[in-house]
């Protein structure tokens, strides 16, 4: 979808937002329980075009403090999936400061050497972007 989107929006007179809305419409028509998103521009677009659609903020948005949670809440995100790197005390502080939003945390799984959403190794070595779900786990290779 991303490659087609870029190719289509390079054409003269094509507006990126209109193309993104057209691409998103069939997804919304399926009536998903929620969309997991991390791009502020796309979140804004979905909020305007489909205000009732539930949005969960992806862990790849790297939300690490209560101020960031409040920002995302103000723009209409319904649930925040917090960064994997947070301690239990940090999660508790966020909950205390932001009692009115759903929070989700990972309790098991891979923990990258970089902060969630900030690793560039896979993209650099293999042209596969971790933020698009295709991380090659370059940080776990046996380097010599």
Range-by-range predicted roles:
Residues 66-67:
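Conserved nucleotide-cofactor-binding alpha/beta core module
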Residues 1-63, 81-85, 90-144:
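Active-site pocket-lining/capping segments in soluble small-molecule metabolic enzymes
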Residues 76-77:
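As written
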